[in-house]
Amino acid sequence: MPSSTAMKHQDIGWHFDNTYAQLPGHFYTKLHPVPVHEPRLVIVNNALAEELGLNFKASSEDELAQLFSGNQLPEGAEPLAQAYAGHQFGHFTYLGDGRAHLIGEHLTPDGKRVDIQFKGSGQTPYARRGDGRAALGPMLREYIISEAMHALGIPTTRSLAIATTGESVYRETVLQGAILTRVASSHLRVGTFEYLAAQEDKAGLKQLTDYAIQRHYPEIIDSDTPYLELLKAVMACQIKLITEWLRVGFIHGVMNTDNMAVSCQTIDYGPCAFMDNYDPNTVFSSIDHMGRYAYANQPRIAQWNLARFAEAILPLLHENIEKAAAMAEEAIQSFKALFQQEWLAMMRRKLGLFGEEKEDMEFITGLLQWMQRSHADYTNTFRDLMDEHFPEEPHYQDQEFKHWYDRWQQRLEHNTKPFPSSLCLMGATNPVVIPRNHRVEAALNAVEQNADFSKLHELLDVLSEPYKDKEKYTEFKNPPAPKERVSQTFCGT
């Protein structure tokens, strides 16, 4: 079996500067990925590589397979598994990177710092009873969705490459093993702070929090209350992130605190899915039996997670714990009003509305209620409203929608900008295509069952320009037929 050794990749352009590895040793465990027998390269994201200042074109497929399987690490890599905890479906537990290795932090040519992480790269001390491996299907799924989210303009981790391992993984069935290379602003999670707080490690907690501020929010370093400002900053950007999810009908599916990044990137695409017909109670995750992480519940869960973040850093907010609790409470209680303001602004953009009117909330809610009752497609409804004439589809012909449409036309007349500006705004806010679940599943099934990658590459191509209405996109705009509907998604761990 090959060993996980370092290899020189000067021509590729790696530039590692590993600051997390300089933090106290109990934050992580340093260890190499577990070598694999027969790695094969599946896909490389050359567009992302170019953004990172990396060039894989001079490397052979075998060299890249060795690299992205973890068998041969880039020079300067300093692999480790991060420790963290988390509230999973509301229950606290100790976790950590059970099947992932942070290879190091790469500096891009423009000075941006990103984590390079392997996922499915072998057991670590945090694996609990897991085998440390990942299957090809779920890794391809994360590749598809994360890159689609990026194209949609939503903050997200990215996918750089996938390699198969030549080994089987055992889930409900025997599956092909694979390793995903993930790129992230960092892997600092709310659960990372919870891990240290649970151990009452105030010194370590302060080091971690100072590190997070320096890495992600340097503008608040000189604040008189930097830790309170951190809480407010993370809350503000999480509100923006969740609002963006709602804009495109995205349902994360497993919003545990270990899956909330303080960088405010979308992270960990397990049982995620996109809503077809509008229903605020939509749930896809097979393990979310009570609908905790349903589409419309995501803002409330974000607030709950942020409250856990506030609890974790409470000792840093003020030396008087009662004053600290009051400061945290005031910040968390502001969530609802801030979210409503952000959501309302987003919905105005979806409808091409400029300016604000007091009836806007009731007006927007009226459309959503009609969409739910008529089982209207969430994505296509907003695109149909961009047509020059009243939409012709049968479900638009009822009196309730016609009445709403007339009100919308009147509201547009009150806009502070002309109608072409409204169309431009709507076009930039409402995607033509999303990663519809049945399309994703069809692409994955073709790969897993027939080793046919054509549907995968076609889907990736379509999703790379989601706001352009091209003729070749026609079939990808269609909602699923009844027999095509995906009713459940799975974690894949």
From Swiss-Prot:
Name any cofactors this protein relies on: Mg(2+); Mn(2+)
Q: Which reaction does it catalyse?
A: L-seryl-[protein] + ATP = 3-O-(5'-adenylyl)-L-seryl-[protein] + diphosphate; L-threonyl-[protein] + ATP = 3-O-(5'-adenylyl)-L-threonyl-[protein] + diphosphate; L-tyrosyl-[protein] + ATP = O-(5'-adenylyl)-L-tyrosyl-[protein] + diphosphate; L-histidyl-[protein] + UTP = N(tele)-(5'-uridylyl)-L-histidyl-[protein] + diphosphate
User: Which InterPro entries has this protein been placed in?
Assistant: SelO
According to the UniProt entry, what is the EC number of this protein?
2.7.7.-, 2.7.7.108
* Active-site residue numbers: D258
Task: Give one GO term, molecular function aspect.
Answer: AMPylase activity
* Keywords, sorted A to Z: ATP-binding, Magnesium, Manganese, Metal-binding, Nucleotide-binding, Nucleotidyltransferase, Transferase
Residues recorded as binding ATP, renumbered to this chain, are G96, G98, R99, K119, D131, G132, R182, R189, D268
Q: Where is the signal peptide?
A: none
Using the UniProt record, name the top-level EC class of this enzyme in a single word: transferase
Question: Which residues of the sequence carry a binding annotation for Mg(2+)?
Answer: N259, D268
Give the region (Disordered) as residue ranges.
Answer: 471-493
Functionally, this protein is described as follows: Nucleotidyltransferase involved in the post-translational modification of proteins. It can catalyze the addition of adenosine monophosphate (AMP) or uridine monophosphate (UMP) to a protein, resulting in modifications known as AMPylation and UMPylation.
Quote the HAMAP family the UniProt record gives: YdiU_SelO
Name the family.
Belongs to the SELO family.
Protein's UniProt name: Protein nucleotidyltransferase YdiU
In which organism is this protein found?
A: Nitrosococcus oceani (strain ATCC 19707 / BCRC 17464 / JCM 30415 / NCIMB 11848 / C-107)
What's the encoding gene here? ydiU
